[in-house]
């Protein structure tokens, strides 16, 4: 494997992101993906078990860090030109036979877990400053093998390199620090991701057994230290954030750890309203409506492994000859399996697989609107989030050159401007229906308009109307895409921010189609 190198004397936000991309590529190649997110290899041969990367300080002091490819932890390191190497207390035995074998191998008196490193450093991650200068000092401290400073220095390096490789949110936090030459303290948003990577990976893998639902809730935080309880893959802070997963299990092998048989949650959609059994009526044929989200029992939906979705003891059902295009609840035993079977797509479309071209729809964005089955046009009126956290996710959307999407021209247009913390025009609300709304005025939606640039639709801001040119999906490849089969991606026109044009374009994965939700 070719090593990834980061030389701080030449580093900027761009070279840092290239370095992180290189690490991800090496660890995530030749493996399978779930929802587009690579799962780390496991059961590797000894010769393929470790990956080396080189970090060089501004003073030209280099260290080689050895990473366990199976679980992405630091195992050992060697200062350049030294006959000494240093292994974590919990390094696997095979590491000593494989790594730095021509050196004197020292064993450190702490292991590579955050808990052990924090204890040895006598502090916590949230008090340790991250940024270019702290990384420079950390590399230098490891190069000089100063025992008192090693735990602290590892906490800096592990977060800025390994944790950033796992999560786009952490990578972007570090990229900002390179761009602005400012340091930052890891907040709960960062620490909650770091502490939950293994659990998030397990739940993503388990979710394939039950419509994208997790077997248990993962507690994450946003940058305002507000709790976001995530219980499915249908959140951009999961799907478009996790860059690598730790291998736990494969559902196809019948592994219990990875099996979710039932899960009860809410379904939110248009204008962040919830799917509700009207009046909590339990009689067969009771209709489904949109209603303000609450904790009432008639908004609780239990997903079963047989494809049924149930509330109040009855099955979510559709049958043209019985109910017209209405969606109702009905006694599960009295209907054919094809009337009560449902699929949820990654993009948030809910369909009955036996009615291939129809999708669950809310034709109006008002409370008590009847839910119906309509021809699937991938419109925002057909976008849903299966999950208990129903509020919009608020954040900035970071694109080319670490610049932020900004609502401009009196909230009628949008393009990239330099990111400014807490600037209202750069704050967006991501709704359950797939709309991206101006946080300041949530009647306004990011829209692929009819005006064109170079034959491609220009993306502007218009009143929300539930149409298919206002629905977006944040994907694992870093794109913000339309949800239909003819997928198009949000694109900075010609990679030129000065054109002030954001357009729809065929997906190609270049930097001008890469976006990070900074929430």
UniProtKB/Swiss-Prot annotation:
UniProt cross-references to PANTHER family, sorted A to Z: PTHR33453, RIBOSOME-INACTIVATING PROTEIN
Native source organism of the sequence: Trichosanthes anguina (Snake gourd)
Ranges occupied by 2-gamma repeats: 486-513
1-alpha repeat boundaries on the chain: 271-311
Free-text function comment from the UniProt entry: Seed lectin similar to type 2 ribosome-inactivating proteins. The Aalpha and Abeta chains constitute the rRNA glycosidase domain and the B chain the carbohydrate-binding lectin domain. Is predicted to have no glycosidase activity and, hence, to be non-toxic, due to small changes in both the nucleotide binding and carbohydrate binding capabilities. Binds galactose and derivatives with a preference for the beta-anomeric forms. Binds prophyrins. Has hemagglutinating activity towards rabbit and human erythrocytes.
Lineage of the species this protein comes from: Eukaryota, Viridiplantae, Streptophyta, Embryophyta, Tracheophyta
Binding sites annotated in the UniProt record for a carbohydrate: 276-279, 296-298, 454, 491-494, 505-508, 512
Record's keyword annotation contains Lipoprotein: no
Protein name as annotated: Seed lectin
Subunit field text: Heterotrimer consisting of Aalpha, Abeta and B chains with Abeta and B being disulfide-linked.
Entries under CDD domains matching the protein: beta-trefoil_Ricin_SGSL_rpt1, beta-trefoil_Ricin_SGSL_rpt2
2-beta repeats: 442-482
Top-level taxon in the UniProt lineage: Eukaryota
């Amino acid at each position: 494997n070719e090593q990834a190198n980061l030389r701080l004397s030449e580093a900027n936000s761009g070279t840092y992101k290239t370095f992180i991309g290189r690490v991800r590529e090496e660890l995530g190649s030749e493996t399978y993906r779930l929802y587009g997110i690579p799962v780390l290899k496991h059961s590797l041969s000894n010769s393929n078990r470790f990956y080396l990367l080189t970090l060089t300080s501004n003073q030209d002091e280099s260290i080689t860090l050895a990473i366990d490819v199976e679980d992405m932890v630091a195992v050992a390191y060697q200062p350049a030109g030294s006959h000494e190497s240093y292994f974590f207390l919990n390094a696997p035995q095979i590491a000593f036979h494989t790594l730095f074998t021509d050196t004197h191998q020292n064993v450190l008196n702490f292991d590579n877990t955050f808990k052990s490193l924090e204890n040895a450093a006598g502090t916590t991650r949230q008090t340790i400053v991250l940024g270019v200068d702290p990384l420079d000092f950390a590399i230098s401290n490891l190069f000089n093998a100063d025992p008192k400073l090693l735990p602290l220095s590892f906490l800096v390096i592990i977060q800025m390199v390994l944790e950033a490789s796992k999560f786009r949110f952490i990578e972007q936090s570090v990229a900002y620090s390179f761009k602005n030459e400012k340091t930052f303290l890891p907040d709960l948003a960062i620490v909650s991701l770091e502490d939950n990577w293994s659990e998030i990976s397990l739940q993503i893998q388990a979710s394939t057994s039950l419509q994208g639902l997790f077997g248990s809730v993962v507690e994450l935080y946003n940058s305002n230290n507000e709790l976001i309880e995530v219980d499915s893959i249908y959140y951009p802070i999961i799907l478009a954030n996790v860059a690598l997963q730790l291998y736990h299990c494969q559902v196809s092998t019948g592994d219990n750890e990875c099996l979710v048989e039932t899960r009860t949650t809410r379904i939110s959609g248009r204008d962040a309203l919830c799917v509700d059994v009207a009046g909590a009526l339990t009689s067969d044929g009771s209709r489904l409506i949109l209603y303000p989200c609450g904790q009432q029992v008639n908004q609780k939906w239990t997903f079963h492994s047989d494809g049924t979705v149930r509330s109040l003891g009855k099955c979510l059902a559709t049958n043209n000859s019985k109910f017209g295009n209405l969606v109702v609840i009905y006694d599960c035993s009295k209907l054919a399996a094809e009337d009560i079977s449902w699929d949820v797509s990654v993009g948030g479309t809910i369909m009955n697989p036996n009615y291939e071209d129809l999708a669950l729809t809310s034709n109006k964005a008002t409370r008590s609107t009847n839910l119906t089955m309509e021809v699937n046009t991938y419109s925002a009126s057909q976008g849903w989030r299966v999950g208990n956290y129903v509020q919009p996710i608020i954040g900035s959307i970071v694109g080319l050159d670490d610049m932020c999407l900004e609502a401009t021209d009196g909230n009628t247009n949008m393009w990239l401007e330099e990111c400014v913390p807490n600037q209202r025009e750069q704050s967006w609300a991501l709704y359950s229906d797939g709309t991206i709304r101006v946080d300041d005025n949530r009647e306004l939606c990011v829209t692929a308009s009819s005006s064109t640039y170079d034959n491609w639709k220009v993306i502007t801001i218009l009143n929300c109307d539930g149409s298919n040119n206002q629905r977006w999906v944040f994907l694992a490849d870093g794109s913000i895409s339309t949800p239909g089969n003819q997928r198009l991606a949000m694109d900075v026109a010609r990679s030129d921010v000065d054109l002030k044009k954001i357009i729809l374009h065929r997906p190609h994965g270049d930097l001008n189609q890469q976006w990070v939700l900074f929430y």
